[in-house]
Amino acid sequence: MGTNILYIEDNPDNMMLVKRALESRGYRLFEAVNGLDGVAAAEKEPIDLILLDINLPDIDGYEVANRLRHSTKHGLAYVPIIAITANALKGDAEKALSSGCDVYMSKPINIRELWARVEAFVPSPNPRLP
């Protein structure tokens, strides 16, 4: 059984890039295109890690992280959350961390950095050399 990652992202190009990168390492990726669907997917599927865009079309990533941290689903409040966002102004990282994210990454997405951040929480089921 592989490691399950939920990526909550409304941009299809970013979704495809991350999906290809993570699936090449053996991760199983679940997709959600908005915050409400992301919260629902996290509460339904067995998730090991969440990648979270901040600028979503319905509720923002800060609210998603807050809802996940207060979820009553067993263990969900402790699932690692990596914020991946174009928000790169002073204070954005702190806001993401204070909302419940464990790590903050700014876009554009650097695949090697993504692999390193993900693997710090959940080892790759199919590791490859960079």
What label would you give each PLM region?
Residues E9:
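Conserved acidic carboxylate
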Residues M16-S24:
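Charged docking surfaces used in two-component/phosphorelay signaling
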Residues G26-V33, A41:
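Short hydrophobic/Thr-rich beta-strand motif most characteristic of the beta2 strand and flanking loop
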Residues D53, T85:
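Active-site residues of response regulator receiver
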Residues P57, L89, P108:
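The feature encodes the CheY-like receiver
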Residues S98, M105-S106:
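Residues at the ends of beta-strands that form strand-to-helix hinge/output surfaces
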Residues I109-V118:
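C-terminal output helix
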